[in-house]
């Protein structure tokens, strides 16, 4: 009996089962112990293969692919700390709803806890973060193939969001020619190999029913809060709120067009919050709210009913309102709960939103990161998409810009880490094939710098804007101790990115004014390559501009 041959047949069943559950993209890191999985993936023509040498970046690449494709994405890594590097992407997927299938190769049980090389305790290492965890046995013909395929099908068939960890131990030898070992074991799956359906088909998940008293609540004074959702959902939510005559507070990720722009500014005005207190119901569609003032208002508001609609399961309200948690696809829920045409009940808020935007426009000429955040909608590629980083940049765009309704916006706003942002943006571009504008800060770019290798392979123009404010300037918005702020919070690195771009053979520009930036963008959108645009700005100007605008709008 050939151990290596049966390892590959065992792996082939696993990989084929994944294809029946909609997996098309598979991300592979180099490794020896994962050889059976890698070769099985390479031989399966149903997969689109992606490779990367850094497992942490690989996990985030898969995350980006899953964001756009809306399908589960598989990841193959070898044993040891390679597995641990997938933790950040797994955590993010669990919070934002992407489906990741982590296939982690492992040493067999007799090599664990005995000093064997590259052997760690992998089963259960991700704690409660995976939706499902499977610790497969060592490949053996004593276990029928139908057990293996049905185990995979059950985990994926019941997966609505988050990750599945499938730990796969393989004994040596890992290499060798294929023979007939295990062929009859594999063939016992019969004509399953010829069709395209799962071995085990799970019943679909039941979602929340129609709220029978909706006809009553839609006649009340309501507020719509729009969090993270798809571009198509964003347009529908905007129309729904407009028909109801309810004010819509749209997050940067809502893709609603933010009909009341600069919400994080005008929510700091007492006139706005006073008017919002008249709301009898708040309907929040989507989670992951960004703006600080929005979160403060959301925590303090006390309507008669607070409804949260999102297809992600679990509690999504850190303010713990009394109300209803409705698990449903947002577009489907809107169809079940049609709007009734009514006149807008808010008078003060539209005026404040207009005045807040005018205050922002009055400051748009200076060359700085706050002004870039406001102007970002002017720089979006046609038929393209936007990827927004974390920390200060997403807050500035949320507060100062107005993105087009239905324009795709992606981010990692689940755990909101700055790790893996470039890798995620690479996945977003690959899955969509669209021109992509990505914007991150300098520390975020440094954190995931080797992901520039992934950005060499794009199918449409990709522009990476690195806003270099020399450190974590978001801490300038917080009451951090002044004497310790620079050394222990901001951590300025005093670096530029020209040589990093050159190392990976990417185009690079460092504009000094808006005209140079716009010229660089026009050039970048012409060719299907990646262009790094480093925008060097005064360190605290962005945070200070936001604080000045907050003070100004609060007194309107």
UniProtKB/Swiss-Prot annotation:
Its EC number is 2.2.1.9. The keyword Signal does not apply. Keywords: Magnesium, Manganese, Menaquinone biosynthesis, Metal-binding, Thiamine pyrophosphate, Transferase. It is an enzyme of class 2 (transferase). InterPro entries: MenaQ_synth_MenD (IPR004433), MenD_middle (IPR032264), THDP-binding (IPR029061), Thiamin_PyroP_enz_TPP-bd_dom (IPR012001), TPP_enzyme_TPP-bd (IPR011766). Binds 1 thiamine pyrophosphate per subunit. The keyword Membrane does not apply. Pathway: Quinol/quinone metabolism; 1,4-dihydroxy-2-naphthoate biosynthesis; 1,4-dihydroxy-2-naphthoate from chorismate: step 2/7; Quinol/quinone metabolism; menaquinone biosynthesis. One of its GO terms (molecular function) is 2-succinyl-5-enolpyruvyl-6-hydroxy-3-cyclohexene-1-carboxylic-acid synthase activity. GO terms for biological process: menaquinone biosynthetic process. It catalyses: isochorismate + 2-oxoglutarate + H(+) = 5-enolpyruvoyl-6-hydroxy-2-succinyl-cyclohex-3-ene-1-carboxylate + CO2. Its cofactor is Mg(2+); Mn(2+); thiamine diphosphate. Homodimer. Catalyzes the thiamine diphosphate-dependent decarboxylation of 2-oxoglutarate and the subsequent addition of the resulting succinic semialdehyde-thiamine pyrophosphate anion to isochorismate to yield 2-succinyl-5-enolpyruvyl-6-hydroxy-3-cyclohexene-1-carboxylate (SEPHCHC). Belongs to the TPP enzyme family. MenD subfamily. This is 2-succinyl-5-enolpyruvyl-6-hydroxy-3-cyclohexene-1-carboxylate synthase. It comes from Escherichia coli (strain SMS-3-5 / SECEC).
């Amino acid at each position: 009996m050939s151990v290596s041959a049966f390892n590959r047949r065992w792996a082939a069943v696993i990989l084929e089962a994944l294809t029946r559950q909609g997996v098309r993209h598979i991300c592979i890191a180099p490794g020896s112990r994962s050889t059976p999985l890698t070769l099985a993936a390479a031989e399966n023509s149903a997969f689109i293969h992606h490779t990367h040498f850094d497992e942490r970046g690989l996990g985030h690449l898969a995350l980006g692919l899953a964001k756009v494709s809306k399908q589960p994405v598989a990841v193959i890594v070898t044993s040891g700390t390679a597995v641990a590097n997938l933790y950040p992407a797994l955590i993010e997927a669990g919070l934002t709803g992407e489906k990741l299938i982590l296939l982690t190769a492992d040493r067999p049980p007799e090599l664990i806890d005995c000093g064997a090389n590259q052997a760690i305790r992998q089963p259960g290492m991700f704690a409660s973060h995976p939706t499902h965890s499977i610790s497969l046995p060592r490949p053996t013909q004593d276990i029928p193939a139908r057990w293996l395929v049905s185990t995979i099908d059950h985990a994926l068939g019941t997966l609505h969001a988050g990750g599945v960890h499938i730990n796969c131990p393989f004994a040596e030898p890992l290499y060798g020619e294929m023979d007939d070992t295990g062929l009859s074991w594999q063939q016992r799956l019969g004509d399953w190999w010829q069709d395209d359906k799962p071995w085990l088909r799970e019943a679909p998940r039941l979602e929340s029913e129609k709220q029978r008293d909706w006809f009553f609540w839609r006649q009340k004074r309501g507020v719509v809060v729009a969090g993270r959702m798809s571009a198509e959902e964003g347009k529908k939510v905007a129309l729904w709120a407009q028909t109801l005559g309810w004010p819509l507070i749209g997050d940067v990720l809502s893709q609603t067009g933010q009909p009341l722009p600069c919400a994080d500014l005008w929510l700091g005005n007492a006139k706005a919050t006073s008017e919002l207190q008249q709301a009898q119901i708040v309907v929040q569609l989507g989670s992951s709210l960004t703006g600080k003032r929005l979160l403060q208002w959301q925590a303090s508001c006390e309507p008669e009913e607070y409804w949260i609609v999102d297809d992600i399961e679990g509690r999504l309200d850190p303010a713990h309102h009394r109300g209803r948690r409705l698990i449903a696809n947002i577009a489907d829920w809107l169809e079940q709960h049609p709007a009734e045409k009514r006149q807008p009940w808010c008078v003060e808020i539209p005026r404040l939103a207009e005045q807040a935007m005018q205050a922002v426009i009055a400051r748009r000429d200076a060359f700085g990161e706050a002004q870039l955040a406001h102007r970002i909608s002017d720089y979006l590629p046609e038929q393209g998409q936007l990827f927004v980083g974390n920390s200060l940049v997403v807050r500035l765009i949320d507060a100062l810009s107005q993105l087009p309704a239905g324009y795709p916006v992606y981010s990692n706003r689940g755990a909101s880490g700055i790790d893996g942002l470039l890798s995620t943006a690479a996945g977003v571009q690959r899955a969509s094939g669209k021109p992509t504008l990505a914007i991150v800060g300098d520390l975020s770019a440094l954190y995931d710098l080797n992901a520039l290798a992934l950005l060499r392979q794009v199918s449409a123009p990709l522009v990476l804007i690195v806003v270099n404010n020399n450190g974590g300037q978001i801490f300038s918005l917080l009451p951090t101790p002044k004497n310790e702020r620079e050394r222990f919070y901001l951590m300025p690195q005093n670096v530029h990115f020209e040589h990093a771009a050159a190392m990976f053979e990417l185009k690079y520009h460092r504009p000094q004014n808006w005209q140079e930036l716009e010229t660089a963008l026009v050039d970048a959108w012409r060719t299907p390559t990646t262009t790094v645009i480093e925008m060097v700005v005064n360190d605290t100007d962005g945070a200070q501009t936001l604080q000045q605008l907050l003070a100004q709008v609060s007194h309107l």
